[in-house]
């Protein structure tokens, strides 16, 4: 059995457990890289099934067969390890497509991808002026996601409270901090790719689906050559960059498609996407083999256990800043994928994410050979999850059906199977 070291910030404890089904896994979260470390990050990953929680990654790098970076924020470390001969699953320099938003726009232009109207705005005074003069725009933070997620400004009056809050938070950086402001794309449908990429190459099959923002996802296995043209066009344009970057990681795109069929790449995910990576881990039989081979620069095709997957995101506002106790019926434990998880003295906890208030604490998934089976399995598995202030958004997987029908009406084909109507599953 191969040995693997997972280096994470804490969000992908469930991925470490899944890899442990095929490998000897050690799990490391850096927590002492600051003057005043806290105990929370040092406890994330404690008690994971089949996983050894370690305090020092460097004593292990020469003992393991490959190293996995499921999240962004490690590109310098990943590149150093690769340059010294270590086998790495990770985005490396490719993560800049996700975190360096303005550089990503420049890269898209260089690669021949259409780019919608957007501006690089420096400083809060300039941002305020821009939002006063422009409506229906999205404000994005480049490089410092912990400050704020992307937010919409429909008009200045509605955005003003958020801008005032951000102005105060930035302190002395308020006049020099850069923002990327994107204008709304007049699109008819959203499309995207969900899978992985090894040195610019994509597997012959992948997951494709619809996300209900921050609540759920419905996906199906589809042949790569049957993906909608806008999805394949974007991947083909990005492939040379991904090859040059030595990209070996999961990969997702979010594309807005206009009435004329023009694909505007809005966002990329160069890590385990959430959603739908929790579905990969159970829908794909040979995940461990794919990751190990990818770390060695080789693409292995996925072996699918089921055709459809349904994912409901688990929320708890209590977990935003407090340790949240959780429990799962052992019969459904395989289908519940918590983030920032630890098990201490037999009790499971979600440990608050450092530096940001995050209410999304995990995913409840179901898989099946029909979409109805996957949705029903997701609903059944949700019955076995307990936690303080916890909600499993199973309603979102039903809502996603409407998005699927809209996509198919605009020639973004989800599946060759006939899809049920939302009302039939309520």
Explain the meaning of each model-derived region.
Residues 1-93:
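ATP-binding N-terminal substructure of ATP-dependent carboxylate-amine bond-forming enzymes
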Residues 47-53, 97, 119-120, 152, ...:
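A structural signal for short, well-ordered beta-strand elements
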Residues 91-157, 161-172:
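A conserved helix-loop-beta module that forms one wall/lid of the active-site cleft
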Residues 141-142, 182-186, 242-246, 302-303, ...:
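Short Gly/Pro-enriched turn/cap motifs at secondary-structure boundaries
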Residues 150-273:
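Internal nucleotide-binding/catalytic subdomain
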Residues 230-252, 259, 269-335:
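Active-site "cap" helix and flanking loop/linker of ATP-utilizing ligase/carboxylase catalytic domains
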Residues 292-426:
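Peripheral (often C-terminal) accessory segments that flank ATP-dependent C-N-forming ligase machineries
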């Amino acid at each position: 059995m191969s040995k693997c070291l997972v280096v994470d910030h804490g969000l992908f404890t469930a991925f470490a457990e899944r890899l442990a089904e095929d490998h000897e896994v050690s799990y490391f979260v850096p927590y002492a890289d600051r003057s005043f470390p806290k105990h929370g990050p040092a406890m994330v990953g404690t008690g994971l099934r089949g996983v050894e929680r370690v305090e020092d990654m460097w004593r292990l790098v020469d003992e393991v067969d490959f190293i996995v970076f499921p999240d962004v924020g490690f590109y310098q470390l990943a590149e150093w390890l690769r340059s010294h001969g270590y086998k790495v699953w990770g985005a490396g320099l490719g993560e800049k497509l996700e975190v360096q938003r303005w550089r990503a726009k420049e890269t898209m232009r260089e690669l021949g991808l259409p780019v919608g109207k957007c501006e690089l705005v420096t400083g809060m005074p300039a941002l305020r002026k821009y939002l006063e003069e422009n409506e229906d725009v999205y404000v994005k933070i480049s490089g410092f996601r912990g400050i704020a997620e992307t937010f919409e400004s429909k008009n200045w009056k509605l955005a003003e409270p958020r801008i005032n809050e951000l102005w105060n938070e930035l302190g002395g950086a308020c006049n020099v901090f850069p923002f990327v402001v994107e204008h709304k794309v007049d699109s008819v449908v959203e499309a995207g790719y969900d899978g992985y990429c090894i040195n610019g190459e994509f597997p012959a099959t992948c997951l494709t689906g619809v996300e209900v923002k921050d609540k759920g996802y419905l996906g199906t296995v589809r042949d790569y050559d049957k993906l909608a043209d806008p999805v394949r066009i974007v991947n083909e344009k990005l492939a040379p960059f991904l090859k040059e970057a030595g990209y070996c990681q999961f990969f997702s795109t979010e594309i807005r498609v206009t009435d004329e069929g023009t694909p505007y790449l809005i966002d990329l995910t160069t890590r385990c996407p959430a959603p739908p990576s929790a579905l990969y881990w159970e829908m794909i039989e040979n995940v461990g083999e794919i990751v190990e081979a990818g770390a060695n620069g080789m693409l292995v095709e996925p072996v699918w256990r089921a055709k459809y997957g349904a994912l409901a995101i688990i929320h708890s506002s209590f977990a935003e800043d407090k340790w949240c106790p959780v429990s799962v019926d052992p019969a459904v434990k395989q289908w519940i994928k918590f983030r920032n998880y630890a098990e201490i003295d037999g009790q499971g906890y979600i440990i608050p994410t450092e530096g940001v208030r995050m209410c999304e604490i995990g995913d409840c998934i179901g898989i099946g050979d029909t979409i109805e089976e996957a949705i029903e399995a997701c609903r059944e598995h949700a019955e076995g999850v307990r936690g303080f202030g916890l909600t499993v958004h199973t309603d979102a997987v039903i809502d996603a059906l409407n998005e699927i029908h809209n996509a198919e009406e605009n020639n973004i084909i989800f599946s060759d199977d006939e899809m049920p109507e939302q009302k039939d599953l309520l």
